[in-house]
């Protein structure tokens, strides 16, 4: 269980975090989103024990992270947004270096490294890290965060700047880690991935938490069910002069409605113009649309 109460962080008069409280369970993926400067990285560093909050409490599995951040280290895997790799080292030596820091034996390092290379589809072949693509470097950084088999992971922009295939691979791997029982806290600008893989999501705005919950809860709180009416019509000119606007999609005309009243208005106008409603789709706004709405 991870519990935070009234976390604040003041940097020389700038309030980077302002009274943030939340709670989520072990074995969940918890996403933190917000515009640039919202406080995401600051919160991740506090959760990781890298910086102390100005005030507030944080408990991770009964560890008081504020008073005893070192107690978290051996069970924490941290991935910063910019992972500075030792580019003259091979991936094998890089993982061995960190494995030794965590007290693993040479045999344990070799076994664990091979497991991670296989899981992450990495074939280092003795190449230096400076020769790796950005995607391979990010996978290596993730392997480094997992070398000591931690159960609690904090990832800052795990897929930032990667091509779609690498980004998708890492998102799928995070799902695998969850199935293995890992607890994951992450920030991301790829909101479609956050929506797809996170159990709970927090939205930060200027250091304040403005939303927290499952996607279902966020939709109920901030989302409005909208409708798309797909219709066919022989004489498109009959639509001219109506108060609604139309677009074309899938070979049909589409009228968008943001309420049941607008839905009834659209279907009535379509009927008056001699059109035929073929189907009606309904949906809640995406996480990206909610963030834009909340951020205004």
Predicted features along the sequence, with ranges:
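Walker A (P-loop) phosphate-binding loop of ABC-type ATPase nucleotide-binding domains
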Residues: 35-39
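Helix-to-loop junction immediately C-terminal to a conserved catalytic motif
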Residues: 48
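Conserved ABC transporter NBD signature motif
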Residues: 56-67, 71-72
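Catalytic Walker B motif of ABC-type/P-loop ATPase nucleotide-binding domains
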Residues: 153-157
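ABC transporter nucleotide-binding domain
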Residues: 172-254
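Short, charged/small-residue-rich alpha-helical element at the C-terminal edge
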Residues: 225-296
């Amino acid at each position: 269980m991870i519990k935070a109460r009234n976390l604040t962080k003041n940097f020389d008069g700038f309030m980077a975090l302002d009274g943030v409280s939340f709670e989520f369970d072990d074995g969940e993926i918890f996403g933190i989103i917000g515009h640039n400067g919202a406080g995401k990285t600051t919160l991740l560093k506090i959760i990781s024990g890298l910086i102390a909050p100005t005030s507030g409490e944080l408990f991770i599995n009964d560890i008081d992270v504020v008073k005893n951040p070192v107690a978290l280290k051996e069970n924490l895997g941290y991935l910063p947004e910019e992972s500075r790799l030792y580019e003259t080292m091979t991936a094998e030596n890089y993982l061995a270096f960190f494995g030794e820091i965590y007290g693993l034996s040479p045999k344990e390092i070799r076994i664990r490294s091979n497991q991670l290379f296989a899981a992450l589809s990495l074939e280092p072949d003795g190449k230096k890290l400076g020769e790796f693509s950005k995607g391979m470097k990010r996978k290596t950084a993730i392997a480094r965060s997992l070398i000591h088999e931690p159960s609690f992971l904090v990832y800052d922009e795990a897929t930032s700047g990667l091509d779609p295939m690498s980004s998708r691979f890492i998102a799928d791997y995070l799902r695998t880690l969850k199935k293995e029982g890992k607890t994951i806290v992450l920030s991301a600008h790829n909101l479609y991935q956050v929506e797809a893989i996170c159990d709970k999501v927090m939205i930060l705005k200027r250091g304040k938490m403005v939303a927290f919950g499952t996607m279902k809860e966020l939709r109920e709180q901030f989302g409005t069910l909208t409708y798309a009416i797909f219709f066919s019509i022989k004489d498109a000119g009959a639509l001219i002069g109506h108060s609604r606007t139309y677009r074309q999609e899938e070979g049909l005309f589409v009228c968008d409605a943001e309420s049941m009243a607008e839905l009834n208005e659209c279907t009535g106008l379509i009927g008056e113009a001699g059109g035929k409603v073929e189907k009606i789709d309904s949906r809640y706004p995406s996480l990206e649309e909610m963030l834009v709405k909340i951020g205004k």
